[in-house]
UniProtKB/Swiss-Prot annotation:
It comes from Neurospora crassa (strain ATCC 24698 / 74-OR23-1A / CBS 708.71 / DSM 1257 / FGSC 987). Residues 395-834 are annotated as: EPSP synthase. Pathway: Metabolic intermediate biosynthesis; chorismate biosynthesis; chorismate from D-erythrose 4-phosphate and phosphoenolpyruvate: step 2/7; Metabolic intermediate biosynthesis; chorismate biosynthesis; chorismate from D-erythrose 4-phosphate and phosphoenolpyruvate: step 3/7; Metabolic intermediate biosynthesis; chorismate biosynthesis; chorismate from D-erythrose 4-phosphate and phosphoenolpyruvate: step 4/7; Metabolic intermediate biosynthesis; chorismate biosynthesis; chorismate from D-erythrose 4-phosphate and phosphoenolpyruvate: step 5/7. This is Pentafunctional AROM polypeptide. In the N-terminal section; belongs to the sugar phosphate cyclases superfamily. Dehydroquinate synthase family. In the 2nd section; belongs to the EPSP synthase family. 7-phospho-2-dehydro-3-deoxy-D-arabino-heptonate binds at residues 129, 145, 151, 161, 193-196, 248, 262-266, 269, 285, 354. ATP binds at G864, M865, R866, G867, A868, G869, K870, S871. The active site is at E258 (proton acceptor), H273 (proton acceptor), C816 (for epsp synthase activity), H1168 (proton acceptor), K1196 (schiff-base intermediate with substrate). Homodimer.
Length: 1563
């Protein structure tokens, strides 16, 4: 043991030196100090289960050596996390203490983070009316904040820390050594409180935090496994903790009970706690406070007490420690599964803040970094808070009439971004004044820092000090994420080419979804032509791109198309001095766009010491010398002229006066001309000096249109001009703005669409827009709100129009103005006195703008061995997806004009064939990226370049599908096939050589379970359609299951699916999915497992839950074989399973790989605790729930019940989570005592089945048993079902349905209700307990007016035989359907009838023209039969029947044997009889029927007669058919089948058909 520490650092609090700080004091000081100075007979050390093993035993050892014999040390551990900090845990600890006879002299040692300190302090404050305690904080957060000051508390449902006491600890022992083992996220979490303290108290400390961020994060993130990973920042750490602790101690000593000054320590907490109350426990306290600080600083800015630069500085400092600054932070979205924080709920949470005075909310407002507005929290009205918290803002008209204001816009975005690049590339230090503090410039700062181009620091709050590295940049392995910052993307693409290789040889630039649509092709072409390697990683001509670290451009002559963006030109100009020889830059392709911005770049380069010469002969040619930028001592960024158009436009539109004091005629920016060239012609008075611009608008409503204005020199300002033109008298035509289509959005279209919401009509021009103005009093109310496309200029432009709109205007994306003017709404409120209100986004707003379409529209490439079934799979796919199928072998032959054998036999040979094949693949990938299906030749994977193309395609969202079936079958088939070139080597060897190539290139695999030539191959089999629906994203199974009150998956416990095919259809009855327990299979070979999935999908016909359960989680798979586990997970994903069970105990890299590759498979993130180490009563499960919430679409937690009460604890746990998150949760207990939890689980409960060899888990029940139990406890209501009609006394329907209800554990009853009057059942079908009804003659038509809706089939047939009550909450909709035709189709298919194809049309026939005939016609049409002959006595009825169906049904009458003979080429192969069997057949009809049955053409093939009558069971017509050698189906089959379908529609359960059949037949 180390020497005891004799003199650690101490801090005085409340007059005593009770805060003790140093390294190593836990084991070398604390025990001795306690025993000497805080004496007791009983010490209790309380910590959490994570810390216990590491820190408690060594302390016990030290303590026991030093303690007298009559002194005892007790220890207790609780689960970690905020969930434990509640009434239940407090009571548990107190009961335990009482059971150990703890008395008033007890001293409690709270070892842990804020949760332990807060709660154990409260236990100490209340146990026996108060016992002594000491704090031993182990987290940075607790060291600098929660352990100091005596605030103790627990959380309650209304919020954090609402029940507690002030109870000062006797000592606070801060051992900095604890921080060595603190997880990275927890350390960063604590930095939020450190930043908070500096922000309110000490700017010097804040500056130190800014400067040390990189060093601190590097140390904290160090992979160094030694005990002292934080050694490099040992002194910094002590300074940070000492500094924060001293501030807190000083404040607490002045204001122990939080009368005023101590409020200041709550900066960031008023809003932060509200976020935390909603997002806990997934978001940590410091993370919530970090977002809260930004929001509260924005609030101070809105109220006019804090400068925008201070907000930006605070936000940047927080972000530099990897803390979130908004709810949109990707980590927050992932941690909380995108949980929303409604503003009303936040305000409700804030209403119970302890600082408040009654209903007045109090918030700490900053006035500068290191200083607060008042020495206490300030009262702030709800309206202001709501604006800052809301995603949208409503603008009310009403600028004061005589307003005359001076507004200074933020620094120019264009100049700011150029200045950052030039300063970073320059040598020396420069101070940049008035830099724009915005999202875009932040992106640029972060990127330049990432490339090690420069170091940055801040002076006086808003002066940026840049120390450039003279162009010495390093490539980075972390992609530069640029969001939607277009300027940054263009400038940095060239800058990335200046980088030197580091541990990587290239840099990736990427951005958000919109950025990936914006063009960058012309710039990339110019760089490539100059020797820089640039690769597109997704879409051609857009980000993401990978730029080689070329160490600079080659130089010489460069050509660039500059008609789309002047930023391409500026990008190359700024990088050119670092080329290996001087650059001549020629702009080609027409007149360059936005010439003033090119001039701006050249003028700024001169300020940084590089002179660009413009050619006298060709003004579009520039000469750039080699050189290094020399940074000026200071550089002042002009205000943004584009942004200045908005305040000036408000003056113009409202008839008031506004001055922009620092933009005039000598501005570098083209948009400075806006006032002179746009506002003056519109009727404004404009005064412009060299450096300032003043605009006074004409009387409101009198702006004049400008017939034509060319805005090419100031394209960004066209949006401002457009909203003014909207209320000007006449039509305004704006041209020269073509580049605005490829900005943050298509701005021209955006203007047109959003102005239309005001009733203003616009016409798009080739390079502009025409706006037809209307009087402002006639502006319509844009009720859905104005969608801003995440475009700052759209938002600000429409805020201008809103200032005179007769209706308040909702602008949907308030925060997007942060890109160039973060304080724009503050400016509107404080300068223009515009009334604003914050609002949530309305639910309807999504209708008016794009949302991603469900499903994957990308083209599909099918690969696989010749003979594996690619062509067949392609045909199925084409039919299911309704996409064209192109066989690339056939397409190659078509393009080449030769067959493949001919190409191979020619001089081109195999090499020439493979080259042509590769070129074709490249062509179709490029030119047919969506909506197609391509079947590739088997050998395409032999070419490495083709493999790379296919692999790249699959990795970028495309589908490459490997089709395979039993290898022996493939080989046998190829031995027979003589139609294609023979293999020159053994077929099996070819397959095994290609197999790894197939697997490498494909991201999905279909293993066909269908033997060659099986009947299923004539149409897409069910298993293939199901597979396709998953991989293409069309399956909505999870959404459907979520709507059910009770759903199940049955756990299959068989070692080989092929040996259980006979029981699987029975086993899956009543379940919504079937679980394949991969860990229980006899072989873990991925190919064997893929075959098991295929066989199961084919046999079960329901979605698959794919599970690899490890030994420690209650399964059989080895715990530590992570490599094989990942292979098996990938096998499941490639097989397109609907659900994959992913254990949260797997290593993070396995979890990340599976979640990244999941496609449209839903992840069930699971944790099982078969050894019962966790309890539902405390927070033990929360860490697993939090992790599952991040990675799963469904969360599954399975514990063990030792007694019935454990199920009630589980129920309470589930209820608390359900209130916080809507992610589906499976949570239950194993064991006999846990059966109740299975009954009550509700969502996808795992079940067994009596036919299975074993249960997958102890205590598992069948679905039928659970339904029986639910009925017994009143959770499953008994419902009444009926048959309506007359006569019905002999019906077999009650026998059918009551048998199926009984077999499936349902408490329902089916009975007869005999009537021939529909009115008799009107009340019955609306009764609460009505479950559904069958309808027969004579009510099939009469019942329809009593229903709310009718299925399409029932409409066509004109009859309803089934009533289904569709329940949606309390609302019940009665839906009518017809299952007669479904029963007919099923009976025919069961008899072997297959669907007709367009290639081989077949006729069908219906006998009779009564009510059932229509269903028979529809059934035959559904099976593809055409023409459909009808044989009946009354030709007029047949004619009327034919006319009532759509023409494509092709219904024809047959009335004589001669007509039968005349139709010799289209004789029916299927006949459905709908005539009664208890009367003789009409003679004329009999002759026609016999002629058809005995026609010579029917000697070949399958011929089936379906008899609809079932009394008698064997009818005369059946005898006629059998005499002619036709197969016959008795009427009871259809009765059974239509009833079987009715049962499915009512219950959602698909029983075994033979069970329904047996009930009908009376077996």
């Amino acid at each position: 043991m180390a020497e005891p520490i004799s003199n650690p650092t101490r801090i005085n609090i409340l007059g005593k030196d009770n805060i003790i700080i140093d390294h190593g004091i836990w084991l070398n000081f604390v025990a001795q100090d306690l025993l000497q100075n805080i004496k007791s007979s009983t010490y209790i050390l309380i910590t959490d289960t994570n810390l216990y093993k590491t820190y408690v035993p060594p302390f016990q050892s030290v303590f026991e050596k030093a303690a007298p014999q009559d002194v005892r040390l007790l220890t207790y551990a609780i689960p970690p996390g905020e969930y434990s900090k509640g009434r239940d845990t407090k009571a548990e600890i107190e009961d335990w203490m009482l059971s150990h006879q703890c008395t008033r002299d007890t001293v409690i040692i709270a070892l842990g983070g804020g949760v332990i300190g807060d709660m154990i302090g409260y236990v100490a404050a209340t146990f026996m009316r108060g016992v002594r305690f000491v704090q031993c904080p182990t987290t940075l957060l607790a060291m600098v904040d929660s352990s100091i000051g005596g605030k103790t508390a627990i959380d309650v449902p209304m919020g954090k820390n609402l029940i507690g006491a002030f109870w000062q600890p006797e000592r606070i022992y801060i051992d900095l050594t604890f921080l060595n083992t603190l997880p990275v996220r927890e350390f960063i979490n604590g930095m939020a409180e450190v930043i908070k303290t500096a922000a309110i108290w000490d700017e010097n400390e804040f500056t130190a935090l800014e400067e040390n961020a990189k060093a601190i994060l590097e140390a904290v993130r160090s992979k160094n496994k030694s005990a002292d990973r934080l050694a490099p920042i040992r002194d910094i750490l002590k300074r940070i903790v000492l500094g924060s602790a001293r501030v807190k101690a000083e404040v607490v000593s002045s204001d122990e009970r939080e009368g005023g000054l101590r409020n200041l320590l709550n900066f960031g907490h008023s809003i932060g706690h509200a976020y935390e109350a909603i997002l806990t426990p997934q978001v940590l306290h410091g993370e919530a406070v970090a977002i809260g600080m930004v929001k509260e600083a924005e609030l101070a800015r809105f109220l006019g007490v804090l400068r925008p630069s201070a907000v930006a500085r605070l936000s940047k400092c927080i972000a530099s420690y990897d803390l979130p600054t908004s709810l949109q932070d990707k980590r927050i979205v992932k941690l909380t599964a995108g949980k929303e924080c409604p503003v009303d709920v936040l305000l409700q949470k804030m209403a119970v803040d302890k600082k408040n005075e009654g209903r007045k909310k109090k918030i700490v407002l900053l006035s500068a970094i290191g200083k607060t507005y008042e020495p206490k929290a300030s009262v702030v009205e709800d309206r202001a808070i709501r604006i800052v918290l809301s995603p949208c803002i409503r603008v009310f008209a009403g600028v004061p009439k005589d307003l005359n204001v001076s507004v200074t816009p933020p620094g120019s975005k264009s100049i700011s971004n150029r200045a950052l690049i030039l300063a970073a590339l320059g040598e020396g230090t420069t101070r940049i004044h008035n830099l724009l503090h915005s999202d875009d410039t932040q992106v640029m700062l972060n990127a330049v820092a990432q490339l090690q181009g420069a170091s940055f620091s801040w002076e006086e709050g808003d002066v940026l000090v840049v120390k450039g590295n003279g162009g010495k940049l390093q490539a980075t392995s972390t992609p530069l994420y640029l969001g939607n910052a277009g300027t940054a993307s263009r400038f940095l693409t060239s800058v990335a080419a200046l980088c030197n290789p580091s541990d990587v040889n290239s840099t990736v630039l990427t951005g958000n979804a919109r950025m990936k649509q914006r063009p960058i092709g012309a710039l990339v072409d110019a760089l490539r032509a100059n020797g820089v390697g640039v690769k597109y990683l997704e879409k051609e001509h857009s980000l993401p791109v990978q730029v080689d670290a070329a160490g600079g451009l080659a130089g010489g002559v460069m050509e660039l198309a500059a008609t789309i963006s002047s930023q391409y030109v500026s990008s190359l100009l700024m990088a050119a001095p670092y080329a290996r020889e001087p650059v001549t830059l020629r702009l080609v392709g027409g007149k360059p766009i936005s010439q003033p911005y090119i001039d701006m770049t050249i003028a700024m380069m001169a300020s940084f010491g590089v002179q660009v010469q413009r050619s006298a002969e060709d003004p579009n040619t520039y000469y750039i010398p080699q050189g290094t930028y020399k940074n000026p001592e200071t550089y002042v960024v002009e205000s943004d002229a584009s942004s200045a158009t908005y305040p000036l436009a408000i003056a113009a539109i409202t008839g008031t006066t506004c001055t922009v004091p620092n933009i005039g005629s000598k501005s570098l920016q083209g948009d400075a001309r806006f006032a002179i060239e746009v506002l003056r012609p519109m009727g404004c008075t404009v005064e412009q000096t060299d450096v300032s611009t003043t605009v006074t608008g004409p009387p409101i409503g009198t702006l004049k249109a400008i017939p034509h204005v060319d805005m090419e020199p100031m394209t960004d300002a066209f949006l401002t001009a457009s909203v003014l033109a909207a209320v000007a008298s006449g039509t305004t035509q704006i041209t020269g703005i073509a580049n605005q289509r490829v900005k943050e959005c298509n701005r021209i279209l955006a203007m047109k669409d959003q102005l239309a919401k005001f009733g203003v009509h616009c016409n798009e021009l080739e390079d502009g827009i025409e706006v037809i103005g209307i009087p402002y009093t006639e502006l319509k109310n844009p009720t859905e709100g104005i969608y801003c496309y995440d475009d700052h200029r759209v938002a600000m432009s429409f805020s201008v129009l809103s200032t005179i709109s007769p209706h308040p205007v909702l602008i949907l994306e308030r925060e997007c103005t942060g890109k160039t003017w973060p304080g724009w709404w503050d400016t509107m409120s404080n300068y223009f006195k515009v009334h604003l209100e914050g609002e949530e986004e309305p639910h309807s707003s999504h209708v008016s703008h794009e949302k991603p379409r469900k499903g994957n529209p990308k083209s599909i490439f099918i690969i696989g061995m010749r003979g594996a079934g690619k062509s067949t799979a392609g045909k199925w796919m084409s039919e299911v997806l309704n996409r064209p199928l192109i066989d690339l072998d056939h397409e190659l032959e078509r393009r080449e004009g030769q067959t493949i054998p001919e190409i191979i036999r020619s001089e081109r040979g195999w090499e020439g064939f493979r080259k042509a094949e590769l070129e074709l693949l490249e062509d179709v990938i490029k030119n047919n990226p969506t909506g197609h299906i391509f079947s590739c030749g088997g050998g395409i994977v032999e070419t490495e370049a083709a493999r790379k193309m296919l692999l790249s395609y699959s990795q970028n969202g495309g589908i490459v599908l490997l089709v395979h079936r039993d290898t022996d079958q493939v080989v046998e088939y190829l031995m027979r096939d003589k139609s294609r070139p023979a293999y020159s080597e053994n077929i099996r060897e070819v397959y095994y050589r290609r197999k790894p190539f197939f697997e490498e290139c494909s991201n999905f695999r279909y293993y066909s379970p269908h033997p060659d030539g099986s009947k299923a191959l004539t149409e897409p089999p069910f298993d293939f359609s199901q597979f396709l629906s998953v991989i293409c994203g069309h399956s909505n199974h999870l959404e459907e299951v979520k709507k059910k009150p009770h759903s199940f998956f049955v756990s299959l416990t068989v070692p080989n699916v092929s040996k259980a095919l006979d029981i699987i259809p029975k086993v899956v009855v009543g379940s919504d999915a079937v679980e394949l327990r991969v860990d229980l299979l006899e072989d873990y070979d991925p190919e064997f497992v893929a075959k098991q999935v295929a066989l199961l999908r084919s046999a079960a016909r329901i979605p698959i839950v794919y599970t690899v359960r490890t030994v420690s989680q209650g399964g059989k798979f080895p715990d530590d074989d992570y490599e094989l586990a990942l292979k098996l997970y990938r096998t499941g994903l490639q097989a397109g399973v609907e659900y994959l069970d992913l254990e949260m105990t797997m290593p993070d890299e396995v979890i990340e790989a599976v979640t990244n590759e999941k496609g449209y498979t839903h992840i069930i993130a699971s944790h099982h605790d078969p050894k019962a180490t966790l309890s539902w009563k405390n927070g033990g499960w929360i860490q697993y729930y939090n992790k599952a919430l991040q990675h799963g679409d469904v969360v599954k937690l399975v514990g063990v019940a030792r007694e019935l009460a454990d199920n009630f604890a589980l129920a309470r746990f589930k209820a608390s989570l359900a209130a916080a998150h809507d992610k589906p949760l499976i949570a239950l207990n194993m064991g006999a005592a846990g059966k109740l939890s299975r009954v009550l689980n509700g969502f996808l409960t795992p079940v067994s089945h009596p036919a299975l060899p074993s249960k997958a888990a102890p205590g598992q029940l069948s679905a039928a048993e659970i339904r029986q139990a639910l009925a017994l406890i009143g959770e499953l209501e008994p419902r009444s079902f009926h048959l309506f009609g007359n006569p019905i006394s002999a019906s077999r329907s009650p026998a059918l349905h009551n048998a199926l209800f009984r077999d499936n554990g349902l408490p329902h009853q089916y009975s007869l209700f005999e009537t021939d009057n529909a009115a008799d059942v009107k009340d019955l079908i609306r009764a609460p307990g009505f479950g559904g009804a069958s309808v027969t003659i004579p009510l099939k038509l009469d019942i329809m007016p009593l229903l709310d809706e009718v299925s399409d089939a029932a409409k066509v047939i004109g009859a309803v035989n089934t009533i289904i009550p569709v329940r949606n909450g309390d609302k019940v909709t009665l839906r009518g359907d017809n299952t007669d035709w479904m029963g007919m189709v099923y009976a025919l298919r069961n008899a072997g009838v297959v669907k007709c194809t367009k290639e081989s049309p077949t006729a069908g026939m219906v006998v009779g023209a009564g009510g059932t005939t229509r269903a028979a016609v529809h059934a035959l049409h559904d099976l593809g039969f055409a023409p459909i002959y009808v044989v009946a006595r009354n030709a007029d009825r047949v004619k009327a029947l034919a006319e009532s169906f759509p023409a494509e049904y092709d219904i024809r009458s047959l009335s004589t044997p001669e007509e039968v003979a005349a139709e010799s080429t289209a004789q029916p192969s299927v006949v459905i009889s709908t005539i009664p069997a208890d009367k003789p057949i009409d003679q004329s009809m009999r002759e026609v029927i016999v002629a058809s049955l005995r026609h010579p053409s029917v000697a070949d093939g399958k011929h089936v007669l379906l008899e609809m009558a079932y009394t008698p069971r064997h009818t005369p017509l059946m005898q006629l058919a059998e005499d002619a050698h036709w197969q016959t189906i008795p009427g009871l089959e259809v009765l059974a089948a239509q009833g079987w379908y009715q049962f499915q529609l009512w219950t959602g359960i698909t029983p075994i058909y033979t069970d329904a059949q047996a009930a009908v037949m009376g077996n």
